[in-house]
């Protein structure tokens, strides 16, 4: 899809009340002109912007976005969004490794250092949900996935608080209404315990830091939820509507940050 058409669609749904946008940018089209056309008339300070591209070009995308935001004179500390870099999902879905996770993650964190509210390390547990996993399997693997980011990057010398604040979880939502509510609430509690085990030190003067200077902000899980495609049928759109509505309501009641 050309950037002009994507921009027009984005502006249309923004006018209808949406406050979070997601864009997929093809690696071969990745340049400053493309980004400018794609984000024309979209105020990056007023809406959450989420981007994905080929895993080998995420650092280039981050650099282009920072340059664009600086050119537009935005306050970079206020911008919210994400860049979908997920080293493990590629192996899970395709059985292939793509580059070195630690070096790419370090470069990505450096490129987005001026964007403190941008999450750039993703846990795409949605893949498991759409493959038919049970709720406990999706939750367990997602937490292990996030812990692996923490483990490898802190071993590489990065502060635990910085790494934790850059991780975003993308969960699927099944039609098991009450258990889905429980899943999201349990995920937040368990992730907070995992992050706390790394003793994240508060990197700035913050009202929310603990009595031993631990960073409580780092323990907050950022969740995007997406309704499942695993249980949809080709033969009855009305059944699909009911299932999707049930899934969306359970995620909303559980307090996810954004939803598709």
What is each residue range found by the language model?
Residues 1-176, 180, 206-209, 217, ...:
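Catalytic alpha/beta active-site cores
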Residues 149-152, 190-194:
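Short, well-ordered amphipathic alpha-helical segments that serve as non-catalytic structural scaffolds
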Residues 154-157, 195, 199:
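Structural motif corresponding to the C-terminal cap of alpha-helices
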Residues 180-192:
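Extended amphipathic alpha-helical segments enriched in small hydrophobics
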Residues 193-198, 213, 222-232, 247-260:
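Structured mid-domain segments that build the active-site/substrate or prosthetic-cofactor binding neighborhood
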Residues 211, 234-237:
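Non-transmembrane, aqueous-exposed alpha-helical and coiled segments at domain scale
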Residues 237-247:
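Short, hydrophobic/aliphatic alpha-helical segments
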């Amino acid at each position: 899809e050309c950037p002009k058409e994507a921009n027009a669609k984005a502006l249309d749904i923004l006018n209808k009340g949406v406050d979070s946008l997601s864009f997929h940018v093809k690696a071969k089209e990745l340049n400053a002109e493309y980004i400018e056309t794609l984000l024309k008339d979209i105020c990056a300070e007023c809406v959450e912007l989420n981007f994905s591209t080929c895993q080998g070009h995420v650092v280039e995308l981050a650099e282009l976005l920072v340059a664009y935001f600086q050119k537009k004179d935005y306050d970079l500390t206020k911008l919210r969004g994400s860049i979908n870099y997920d080293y493990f999902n590629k192996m899970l879905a395709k059985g292939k490794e793509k580059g070195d996770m630690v070096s790419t993650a370090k470069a990505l964190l450096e490129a987005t250092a001026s964007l403190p509210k941008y999450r750039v390390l993703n846990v795409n547990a949605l893949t498991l949900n759409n493959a038919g996993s049970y709720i406990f399997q999706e939750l367990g693997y997602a937490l292990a996935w996030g812990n692996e980011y923490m483990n490898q990057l802190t071993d590489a010398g990065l502060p635990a608080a910085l790494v934790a604040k850059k991780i975003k979880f993308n969960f699927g939502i099944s039609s098991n209404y009450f258990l889905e509510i429980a899943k999201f609430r349990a995920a937040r509690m368990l992730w907070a315990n995992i992050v706390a085990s790394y003793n994240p030190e508060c990197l700035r003067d913050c009202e929310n830091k603990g009595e031993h200077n631990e960073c409580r902000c780092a323990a907050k899980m950022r969740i995007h939820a997406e309704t499942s495609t695993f249980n949809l049928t080709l033969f009855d759109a009305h059944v699909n509507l009911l299932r999707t509505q049930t899934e969306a309501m359970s995620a909303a009641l559980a307090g996810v940050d954004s939803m598709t």
